[in-house]
Design a protein with these regions (language model features):
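A short glycine/small-residue-enriched secondary-structure motif
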Residues: 162-167, 207-218
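Helix-adjacent hinge/juxtasegments
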Residues: 220-264
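An amphipathic alpha-helix signature
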Residues: 161-165, 187, 191, 238, ...
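Active-site alpha-helix of zinc metalloproteases
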Residues: 208-212, 221, 252, 272-273
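Short alpha-helical hairpin
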Residues: 150-168
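Divalent metal-dependent phosphate-bond-processing catalytic cores, especially two-metal-ion Mg2+/Mn2+ enzymes
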Residues: 2-154, 174-204, 215, 225, ...
Length: 332
């Protein structure tokens, strides 16, 4: 990338940070932003990552932001990356006590998140799409022909506004989990199946499918440390969608448990999401970190069976029944 293009990138980021929306949510003034966006610093640092040829880590972006962040005062005890991950989770699931206790660090977290989003937007524009690492959302023109287009537009707006993708990327670096890989993988499988059904003439709403698949596990980021994620994340997923007035997408997203297959009157969008969630599994490597993969139905059956609590003959038969419905769907 030429010096001119590097200068242009730095100028575009500065312009984005000077917009009223960012200034309002960060509490920074335009003068503060100009102090953080020292021209020489950003042009020197951007020359190291542009042109983008591979995925840029949150750590690499933090190292660029480290010096400007120091101008805002001391860093959080847990460091800026871990704190910003906690902070962005509380954007989705606000907590008055957390906000009050960490008010001194909110501007820094907002700044880091905005820079992450800027870099990841540029990354997305030049790198090949990877199904386990990002989302191929419907464009506005394609989405407009479906019934849930308005809700889907809201979903995409809040997905960006609340830094949900950036949250998932941080999650992969500051925790042992690979939640992004699972959610993105489920979205990929669901949309592959949904597009195939749509092409075959099956009446399916692609906006409903995409929004529900991309949002189906958002509740995992709302669960508190002492809460059982496998049981409560459905509740928190539903809460997020309800708080943003997305009733239809939220209903599909929150009801994606295998047991939700038991009712007979299941929508095709629900069936597609449950099928995709069933297929995209995670195991743990020797280092304790999650490994995401797309399994076949038989493998997925055994993985989920091993995780079920209090399995007796009645519960096993229920599980076999819902599994058979997925097999019938796949055969179809």
């Amino acid at each position: 990338m030429s010096k001119k293009e590097v200068r242009q990138a730095a100028a575009e980021l500065t312009e984005r940070l000077c917009e009223k929306d960012f200034l309002d949510r960060s509490g920074l003034s335009r003068k503060n932003v100009m102090m953080l966006m020292n021209k020489d610093h950003w042009e020197e640092q951007f020359a190291h990552i542009f042109p983008i040829k591979k995925r840029i880590s949150c750590r690499a972006v933090y190292e660029i932001c480290e010096e400007p962040l120091s101008l805002l005062g001391h860093e959080p005890e847990e460091g800026w990356m871990k704190f910003t991950y906690q902070y962005v989770c509380h954007i989705l699931y606000p907590d008055a006590e957390f906000k009050k206790e960490n008010a001194a660090f909110s501007a820094g977290a907002e700044f880091y998140l905005a820079v992450l989003q800027f870099v990841f937007d540029r990354e997305r524009a030049v790198l090949p799409y990877k199904p386990m690492e990002d989302f191929a959302f419907l464009g506005d023109e394609e989405a407009s022909s479906f019934e849930c287009a308005a809700e889907y537009s809201r979903f995409k707006k809040f997905f960006a506004q609340e830094y949900i993708y950036e949250m998932m990327r941080l999650n992969a670096e500051v925790t042992p989990f690979r939640t992004l890989e699972h959610i993105a993988g489920v979205h990929y499988v669901a949309m592959t199946v949904a597009r195939g059904l749509y092409a075959a003439g099956v009446p399916i709403d692609l906006t409903l499918t995409s929004g529900a698949a991309a949002g189906h596990d958002l509740g995992k980021f709302g669960c508190k440390p002492n809460e059982r994620v496998p049981y409560l994340h459905y509740y928190y997923t539903n809460q997020w969608f309800n708080n943003h007035s997305m009733e239809y997408i939220g209903h599909i997203a929150a009801n994606h448990s295998t047991w939700d297959l038991e009712p007979e009157n299941l929508s095709v969008e629900s069936l597609v999401l449950i099928y995709a969630d069933f297929r995209v599994k995670q195991s743990r490597g020797d280092d304790g970190r999650e490994i995401t993969y797309i399994s076949n139905l038989d493998e997925a059956f055994n993985v989920i069976l091993s995780k079920l609590d209090n399995v007796d003959e009645v519960k096993l038969n229920r599980y076999r029944f819902v599994y058979s419905k997925l097999h019938d769907f796949e055969d179809y």
